[in-house]
Structures are given as C-alpha cells and as structure tokens.
Regions:
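Hydrophobic anchor at the beta1->P-loop junction of P-loop NTPases
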Residues: 11
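Small-molecule kinase domains that catalyze NTP-dependent phosphoryl transfer to phosphate-bearing small molecules
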Residues: 67, 118-124, 132-137, 141, ...
C-alpha cells in the first residue's frame, strides 16, 4: 500500500453513482476516516418525518431549525449512521426518505448544520467524504476532488438492487423517476447546487468494477502527489 499525506479527499456526484461505496473503500485502502454527508442529510430527513417537520407536500416547518440544535447524528462502528444510540442506517436508505431528502437538503439552515457537523467530524484531518457539494462548498480547498457519474439506468438499477437487498419491494420505474427528479432538484437549488468543481477529476463508473475504480484512484493519487507504488 502506498503512503499518502494527510489530505482531504472530496467525492461528489449524482445519487446512486456509488459514491459512498467508493469512498468507504478508498478510506479502507489508505487508512482514512470516512464521512458520509448524504447519510447526515438522510438522517435529518428521517428526523423531520418522525417529528412532523415536513409534510406530504414537501413543505418544511421552520421549527426544524431549532430542533436541529438537539439532534445527535454521528457515525458508529463500521461507518453506520446513528441517531443518538439508535442505528438508522437501514431506515435512511428507504424510498420514503429518498423521496424527501432533496427538499430537506435544499433548506439553507439544514445545509449549514450538516456542513458544521462535517467540519467537526473531520477536524482530525486525513478524511475522505462524499456528497453533492463537498468539493465546491463544504471543503473547497480539498487537496483531491473526484466527481462521479454514471448512466441513469445504471444508477437506478444500483438503487433498486440495494433496496431489494434490504428487504424492500421497489418498482424500477419509480426508482428511476425518483432519481431523475433528485438530479433536477439537486442541480437547480439556489444553495450549493450540484455541480462539478473546476479542479475535480471525473470518474464515470457505469461499466467499472470496484477494483477498477480503486486502481484508477491509486494511479491518480500517485500521479498527483508524485508517489511511488
């Protein structure tokens, strides 16, 4: 394994491009701390749903801002997302949460809360994190930025398979429609819209295995930082 300096690696991209899986494997391979910003947004969404801070029409209550002050979201053993002492990893990946995470993530004070949480968790340095605006907004000075993309149908199939594996009963057409709707909302919101940072390296993993993705990023790191394998 190559030794790399204590840097911040930002991984951005559309939903279901495999950002989390990729970032987790990069963290494992290079002994980095992994932070999943998307899980925090999903955790806030679940919290809002359970406490009636968002309705069926995706209208977010102003009371959520004050309620966030007492919300404890963190990552437990294995990188699972927890709300207090409760593991919510499976719940935040449900279709119900997926359908409302974009409206929640578009709220400026929610984005500020997540950003502050990420900076707190990343204070020790040597981290890799994934999301929609890590390299453009949260950590614009990250030493390495990667923007992940894949074909719509490939991304929808990944999400469909993930939901099936967790005991869900998804409909592929609904998953695909939800994915495209989220893409539109994420890229058109007024606060920190989804976009590729000018200095980000693009990774289209539509037809790549994880081993191929890791080989790609290792070559990128070696070339960018002048390291020998």
């Amino acid at each position: 394994m190559i030794e790399i300096p204590d840097i911040t690696i930002a991984v951005d991209g559309c939903s279901s491009t495999g950002k989390s899986s990729f970032a987790k494997e990069v963290a494992k391979k290079f002994n980095f701390l992994y932070l999943d910003s998307g899980a925090l947004y999903r955790g806030v969404t679940l919290f809002a749903q359970e406490n009636a801070y968002i309705d069926a029409g995706n209208v977010v209550s102003d009371d959520l801002e004050t309620a966030l002050e007492a919300l404890d979201l963190h990552f437990g053993e294995g990188g699972v997302c927890c709300m207090g002492d409760r593991c919510i990893e499976a719940e935040i990946r449900s279709m119900g949460v997926s359908s409302q995470v974009s409206p929640i993530a578009a709220v400026p004070y929610v984005r500020n809360w997540v950003d502050e949480r990420l900076h707190f968790l990343a204070a020790s340095g040597r981290v890799v994190m994934d999301g929609r605006d890590i390299g453009t907004s949260v950590f614009p000075n990250a030493e390495l930025k990667i923007y992940m993309t894949a074909r719509d149908e490939v991304r929808a199939q990944r999400r469909f398979d993930e939901m099936k594996a967790k005991g869900g009963n998804p409909v592929f057409e609904e998953v695909l429609a939800n994915l495209r709707e989220r893409d539109y909302i994420d890229s058109h919101r007024s606060t920190s819209p989804l976009r590729k940072a000018e200095d980000a390296f693009e990774l289209d993993n539509s037809d790549m295995t994880m081993a191929e993705e890791l080989s790609w990023v290792q070559g990128l790191i070696q070339g960018r930082f002048g390291l020998l394998g």
